[in-house]
């Protein structure tokens, strides 16, 4: 019985820390740049909820859409990660040169996720499970199958 109480106490003590690290739910309107991005690329999908994360001078927004897509954006409305969770992302969110490369080389595949990495690299996950890594000039530099 004491072990059970200790476990419950530990879980309750740690939950606020985990919640703060992940950001807090927000009922404030999203910044205009983010709202414009969403209406441009995801006009047919509603926002389920969004969270704000503040780390030092780095403000981020995690937007969760009703279709399961998760989008992380900076305060300027630039996406840093878009994860469709096995749902195809709209081609309009994929950088044009990357979309052209995928259309020409993987015509039967769709993009499931985009992730901006360090040194201006973009990782693209395709519907076949392959991960393509592009440099800042949108040149393919690695394939992980």
Regions found by a protein language model. Name each.
Residues 22-145:
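Interaction-mediating elements
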Residues 1-10:
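Bacterial N-terminal signal peptides that target proteins for export
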Residues 19:
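Glycine-rich phosphate- or other oxyanion-binding loops that anchor nucleotides, phosphorylated ligands
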């Amino acid at each position: 019985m004491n072990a059970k109480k200790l476990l419950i106490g530990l879980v309750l003590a740690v939950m606020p820390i985990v919640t703060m690290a992940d950001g807090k739910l927000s009922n404030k309107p999203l910044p205009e740049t983010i709202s414009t991005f969403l209406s441009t690329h995801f006009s047919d999908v509603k926002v389920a909820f969004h969270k704000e994360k503040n780390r030092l001078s780095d403000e981020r927004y995690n937007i969760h859409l009703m279709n399961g897509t998760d989008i992380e954006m900076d305060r300027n409305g630039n996406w840093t990660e878009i994860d469709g969770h096995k749902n195809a992302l709209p081609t309009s969110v994929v950088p044009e040169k990357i979309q052209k490369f995928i259309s020409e080389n993987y015509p039967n595949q769709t993009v499931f996720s985009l992730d901006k990495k360090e040194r201006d690299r973009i990782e693209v996950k395709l519907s076949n499970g392959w991960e393509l890594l592009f440099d800042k000039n949108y040149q393919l530099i690695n394939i992980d199958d």
